[in-house]
Amino acid sequence: MSWGTELWDQFDNLEKHTQWGIDFLDKYAKFVKERLEIEQNYAKQLRNLVKKYCPKRSAKDEEPRFTSCLSFYNILNELNDYAGQREVVAEEMGHRVYAEIMRYSNDIKGERKSHLQEGRKAQQYLDMCLKQMDNSKRKFERECREAEKAQQTYERLDNDSNATKSDVEKAKQQLHLRTHMADESKNEYAAQLQNYNAEQHKHFYIVIPQVYKHLQEMDERRTVKLSECYKGFADAERKVIPIISKCLEGMVQAAKSVDERRDSQIVVDCFKSGFEPNGDYPFEDYSQHIYRTVSDGTISTPKQESLKPDPRVTVGKAKGKLWLFGKKPKGPALEDFSHLPPEQRRKRLQQRIDELSRELQKEMDQKDALNKMKDVYEKNPQMGDPSSLHPKIAETTSNIERLRMEIHKNEAWLSEVEGKVSQRSERRHSAEANHLVAQGRESPEGSYTEDANQEGRVQPQPHAHPEFDDEFDDDEPLPAIGHCKSLYPFDGNNEGTLAMKEGEVLYIIEEDKGDGWTRARKQNGEEGYVPTSYIDITLEKNSKGAVTYI
């Protein structure tokens, strides 16, 4: 199958077909360009998406690292790698497909133009030969007619008796001339005809088949190039499939790494305050003196002091802790983290001690290295001056002392926190035990069994007017055990808290029990809890000695 033999007379159609082939090549190149632009935009959008949702945390950020968050961040990293592979696909399409098609399209356009020009030249040469043959043919025809006319004239004059001899001779010469010219035209026509036939045979069997063969080869190469580009287009995707599969596998592994129990423990570690829950409210039996009057026949002074609940563990204190489940009052961050709950304070102090210990180890290693270098300099003075290291050694020694003092100070704070938490737990268990013992001593009739030990421990306080005790017990204010001065303003929005201004002087009626809150009273008698870290406390000597907390 050859275009030169099968399509010898289809030059115009072949010209249109080859032009269509080049247009189709350009169309596919445009498709590839738009396809790689889609890949580039897709990769860019993926990277922007990853950048948008990646965590923006500083090196000192202590955000809890939940496994679900870590898994999501790992998925974002894998997605970023996936976006990189989409960029590789776009780059591969651009280099191996689009650039190759554009280069080949320019080459094939020039080649097609050359082959078509060659075919047109061959056709023009054949047309010229045909025209020359036609001219010689018409000339031969014309000369033959002239010779025929000359012969008719000669025969007419030769048969005419009136014609002169000179006229006959002249007609005869004209006849010979026309006959000779006709013979020459005949020979020329024969030569032109033979030449045209030869050129026509050469044109249709040699020149045109060669031109069409080149066009056919060009078109077939174009088809092969398209096939290669189709394959390269698919190979660009196939080459990144293993890496993309690894990215997807990484996402699956990240999903499997989610641990709900660990996340729950992180929540506990992050928000555990170390506070103890409020104890049970004691039963306040106001009917004891009634039953004792009926049974004994006398009216005795009830042991109201022993029955009166401790105001420091009742409503006031419960209200003071409501911030644990509401909006925690904010204050300035202190060096000893006393503004934090006990458990969080303990964790932060331990973290700081660990950091300081690492810094101390670095400084000690540096000091050892400097001492070794100093020894080397002393043994080999040509290597350096030992005295040049003295400032650095002194600075390192100073840093070591400073870090040791910091560690000692933070360890003291840590011991204080751990001691307070332990004491608070012991107080709570002791209070619960006493409450259970008191309940166990109550008789079914509502009276109390006399206990010499208990009577020795708990003595009723005499009152000048016992008949008014029940009426004013709840309103009797607690005695002040010291005073304090507020260092910072406090809004006191939560129930049970006391608002105060900076520099305001308050009375202390209950010390901090390790929860970071101190009970105080204003000059106008208003009571409530204030943050211990917000005030400068001075206790009276007759209570526990003059002690100042800052």
Curated annotation (Swiss-Prot):
Top-level taxon in the UniProt lineage: Eukaryota
Intracellular or extracellular location(s): Cytoplasm; Cytoplasm, Cytoskeleton; Cytoplasm, Cell cortex; Cytoplasmic vesicle
Keywords for this protein: Autophagy, Cell membrane, Coiled coil, Cytoplasm, Cytoplasmic vesicle, Cytoskeleton, Endocytosis, Lipid-binding, Membrane, SH3 domain
F-BAR domain span: 1-263
Site (Mediates end-to-end attachment of dimers) location in chain: K165
InterPro entries hit by this protein: AH/BAR_dom_sf (IPR027267), F_BAR (IPR031160), FCH_dom (IPR001060), FNBP1L_F-BAR (IPR035494), FNBP1L_SH3 (IPR035493), HR1_rho-bd (IPR011072), SH3-like_dom_sf (IPR036028), SH3_domain (IPR001452)
Predominant location: cytoplasm
Coiled coil ranges: 66-258, 334-426
Stated role: Required to coordinate membrane tubulation with reorganization of the actin cytoskeleton during endocytosis. Promotes cdc42-induced actin polymerization by activating the wasl-waspip complex, the predominant form of wasl/n-wasp in cells. Essential for autophagy of intracellular bacterial pathogens.
Name the UniProt record assigns to this protein: Formin-binding protein 1-like
Gene that encodes it: fnbp1l
